[in-house]
Amino acid sequence: MRKAIEFIQSKNNIGFVSAGNTGAVTALSKILLGTLENIKRPAFCSMIPTLKGFCIMLDLGANKESNENHLLQFSIMGHAFAKIKNISNPKVAILNI
């Protein structure tokens, strides 16, 4: 896993698939790749298809408990991802199951 993440770090690849431990992949990614400024907790992200295109969802089961600071950080990461996808005015919402 470390070699795969280092390969991403060297800009030779943009992602990888692992059958390894999710916690290990997440921890190594945070250590080697870093996070956005002021982001303390990484979150899994997926693009979910909708009738109007797609929805970007973060923290898809990665954290058992999240406080208000974590939710704010998730919204910052979602907004950054939306900018990459050229979404100029993204809506941010909370879904709790």
Regions found by a protein language model. Give the residues of each.
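Anion-binding alpha/beta catalytic cores of soluble intermediary-metabolism enzymes, centered on
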Residues: 6-10, 15, 19-97
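Short, structured active-site "lid" loops
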Residues: 1
